[in-house]
């Protein structure tokens, strides 16, 4: 995961200090890209321990089209707590846009099901895209989508995914985003009969919050370790049938967790 450490160093060395919505302050760069060959291991950060349970459950929650944090809380995941209202609702966030995008004629478009169908029918299509950025509903969302658009690409029997992330919390959020979309790529590859290719992560505003500088420098002192392997239950052929128990991580030997505060 040297690519991630290089991103963090790049932001520290070349970023611009800016004010931000949360009032914390950031150091920010605009436009950056990382690539991960999924054949080389599962890109789960090893220079600090990550909570895989949260990553898996959040992805399953997105895919279910859910926008209430009840499922997450029931499974010990607290990453969305700060943004939910008193009923646990977040508004029309990721899951709603992925699975039930509202069309002007009153229909609701299941982008994920459409994507799977297109990969199977026309894998060379350049329209294998899912968007969570709906300008008509952004103001109704508790938090507008940071990872807002992704595209799949099929070549030589391999499935690759590129994510465009408009806003990226490099220390806390990006490690989750890498693992989440890498896992999604493995899942989609399995159910469409393809092999995993690359995960390409493209950023708009990539930033370190000013209260994460010390933690970032600590992490940069750590040597990356061998990547783990993520195994999926081979029996699952329906993307929406995956459950938490269908994922097994092997060989994960990270450095200790580094605590940092979330800017809301």
From Swiss-Prot:
DUMP binds at residues 21, 126-127, 166-169, 177, 207-209. (6R)-5,10-methylene-5,6,7,8-tetrahydrofolate binds at residues 51, 169, 263. Pathway: Pyrimidine metabolism; dTTP biosynthesis. GO terms for cellular component: cytosol. GO terms for biological process: dTMP biosynthetic process; dTTP biosynthetic process; methylation. It catalyses: dUMP + (6R)-5,10-methylene-5,6,7,8-tetrahydrofolate = 7,8-dihydrofolate + dTMP. The keyword Repeat does not apply. The active site is at 146 (nucleophile). One of its GO terms (molecular function) is thymidylate synthase activity. It comes from the Bacteria. Keywords: Cytoplasm, Methyltransferase, Nucleotide biosynthesis, Transferase. It is found in: Cytoplasm. InterPro entries: Thymidate_synth/dCMP_Mease, Thymidate_synth/dCMP_Mease_dom, Thymidate_synth/dCMP_Mease_sf, Thymidylate_synthase, Thymidylate_synthase_AS. PROSITE patterns: THYMIDYLATE_SYNTHASE. Its EC number is 2.1.1.45. It is an enzyme of class 2 (transferase). Belongs to the thymidylate synthase family. Bacterial-type ThyA subfamily. Catalyzes the reductive methylation of 2'-deoxyuridine-5'-monophosphate (dUMP) to 2'-deoxythymidine-5'-monophosphate (dTMP) while utilizing 5,10-methylenetetrahydrofolate (mTHF) as the methyl donor and reductant in the reaction, yielding dihydrofolate (DHF) as a by-product. This enzymatic reaction provides an intracellular de novo source of dTMP, an essential precursor for DNA biosynthesis. Homodimer. This is Thymidylate synthase. It comes from Laribacter hongkongensis (strain HLHK9). The lineage of its organism: Bacteria, Pseudomonadati, Pseudomonadota, Betaproteobacteria, Neisseriales.
């Amino acid at each position: 995961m040297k690519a991630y450490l290089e991103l963090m160093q790049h932001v520290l060395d070349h970023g611009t200090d800016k004010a931000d919505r949360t009032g914390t302050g950031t150091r920010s760069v605009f436009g950056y890209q990382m690539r991960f060959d999924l054949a080389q291991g599962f890109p789960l950060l090893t220079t600090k321990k990550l909570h895989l349970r949260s990553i898996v459950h959040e992805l399953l929650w997105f895919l279910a089209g859910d926008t209430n944090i009840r499922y997450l809380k029931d499974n010990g995941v607290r990453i969305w707590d700060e943004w939910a209202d008193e009923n646990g609702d977040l508004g029309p966030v990721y899951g709603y846009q992925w699975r039930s995008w509202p069309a002007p004629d009153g229909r609701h478009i299941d982008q994920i099901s459409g994507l799977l169908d297109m990969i199977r029918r026309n894998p060379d299509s350049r329209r294998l895209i899912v968007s969570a950025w709906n300008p008509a509903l952004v103001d109704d969302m508790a938090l507008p989508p940071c990872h807002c658009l992704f595209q799949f690409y099929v070549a030589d029997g391999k499935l690759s995914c590129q994510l465009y992330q408009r806003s990226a919390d490099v220390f806390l959020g990006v490690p989750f985003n890498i693992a989440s979309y890498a896992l999604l790529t493995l899942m989609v590859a399995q159910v469409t009969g393809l092999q995993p290719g690359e995960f390409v992560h493209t950023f708009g505003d990539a930033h370190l919050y000013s209260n994460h500088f010390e933690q970032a420098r600590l992490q940069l002192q750590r040597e990356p370790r061998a990547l783990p392997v993520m195994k999926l239950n081979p029996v699952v052929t329906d993307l929406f049938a995956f459950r938490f128990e269908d994922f097994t991580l092997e060989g994960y030997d990270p450095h200790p967790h580094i605590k940092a505060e979330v800017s809301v």
